[in-house]
Amino acid sequence: MKENNNAEILELKKQFTALQQKCGAKTDTIVRLGQDLEKSENEKKGLAARVETLERNLERSERELQLVCACQNDMKIKFGTERQDLIEDIEKYKRENQQLRTDRQELLDQKADLKKDCKTFRQTIAQFEVEKMGGPVRNSFSTENDEVSKLEAHEKLQAKCKGLESDLRSMLGIKEELLMERDEMQRKVARLSNELSYLLNGDPRRVAEDLDSLVAENRFLKAKLNTAEEESESIKMTLAKYKQMAEAVNVQTMVNRSPKAGEGDDKPSVAVINMKQIRELLASHAIELVESDYRAITTILLDLCNDKQMALAHSRRANKVLGMRLHEVESKLAVLDIKSRSSSPRHELPRDEDIELVVPKAVASTSSK
């Protein structure tokens, strides 16, 4: 009977041990399944966060694309207007050049006519001089009235010749000026043609950015010069004020050091200059202050406050100028970046239908589920 009971107990122990092992295995399986489930949940959250990030990136890219398209349209409109203006300027300069050429031809014709007139007048003067030199052998019946009339005619012709010579000199001067203006206009037309070709071809040698940078630099230097002048004036005023204060302090020190009726050397003289001395003076109990000392301290504190306010105003003005300069530089850099991207064929912007978002397969399957 006991042997049977022992056998049953052993059998029950074996079964209990086997059940414990099975229970441990099931527990391990459940723990592993829980870990796998938690890991899957974490992966699901990470994929969801990645999907949200990609969606935000897509929205931001779309907004940036819209801004770039708007900037490109503005640049196209501005380029069209600038091109039209340059074409109109070139046409106007061509017309002016043609007008100058016609004026030059007219001046040349006038010069030729004046040369012919001068030649005619020289021949007339020479003939008259020959006739005058042959006066002693002329006929005896020539009268004195004929000589007077010939002299008057000769004087008139000489005055007219001098007037024509002066007109010729003035015409030659006008011709030289017109030639200089024509050469200057030709150089200007050539320069504008080069600038137009640079602008049309997108050449980096175009002068638009350089002019803008020069104008901005000039504005910045002008503001800086005004600030320096204001600071110089404020420094001069401060120096004059401190000079007056030093003179007043010296006078007050001399008065306090002089002997007074009813007072000895028990009360020391007070001369306050800076904040450190003011603090030490107010903190010390060995010095007795009167109403005049408090007034002097108040005046010095007020002057210090005014100086601080003036320095703060100057620093704010300088910061404002620097901020404007920084804003201009940033805007110029942005415009240059957009121009370089739009001008180079390697940075052509894709169309709306060519933009695709590459999403991993795992993310796509998770989002579809």
From Swiss-Prot:
Its main location: other. Expressed in amphid and phasmid ciliated neurons, and also pharyngeal, touch receptor and motor neurons. The gene is ccdc-149. Belongs to the CCDC149 family. InterPro entries: Coiled-coil_dom-contain_pr_149. It is found in: Cell projection, Cilium. Residues 1-249 form a coiled coil. It comes from the Eukaryota. One of its GO terms (cellular component) is ciliary base. The keyword Protein transport does not apply. Keywords: Cell projection, Cilium, Coiled coil. It holds the Pfam family CC149. This is Coiled-coil domain-containing protein 149.
